[in-house]
Amino acid sequence: MTRLIQHRANNLESLKGITSNFGAEIDLRLHYGRLILAHEPLVDGCEFVTWLYEYEGSLLVVNVKEMGLEDLIVNQIISVNPQLDYFFLDQSTPYLIRSIVKGYRCAARISEYETVDSAFSQNTTWLWVDSFTGDWTHLIELSQRLDKEHRRKKICLVSPELQGRTLKESNEVLLLLNQIKELQLEFDAVCTKFSPIWEKLLV
């Protein structure tokens, strides 16, 4: 089953409709010593622990907006919902390596500008597969690498609208899904702003 990840679910209002079959992507940073959800700096937001108690999703994508918060984040996740599946995204290299050594779940990025070789060298649990321009040819190399190494990686696909392209008026997603089918790639999650559209596409 492919789980749909709601992009920037940074407040309690955004949790409506997120059930056990769904997930959320959030931004975490410190604000006067409190761990809060906020994409931009110097603004207040919902405290992470408060948000966690309301969260009913089965997967959490954590975009760490300040370096070195991983221990605090994991401790709060364990204290509220130790069974919650999660992974860190967009970490700087030193903190990514540190997190992997500690056994934390992390993602490596793959796109036109971030190579498959680099992603596999990082030994992460998840791959965050993106396209900034609409060019998805890196999926071919990803498929070949997975076949060659017989390694099962969890994969999250980034929906085109997260990079500013229009989802509703474009056939990019249909072409993308056809390419995924031809390559026999298996995606575990899709991060999107428009879960209802993807629900129909994945039927």
Segments (PLM) and residue ranges:
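Phosphate-group recognition and catalysis centered on beta-loop-alpha active-site segments
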Residues: 1-203
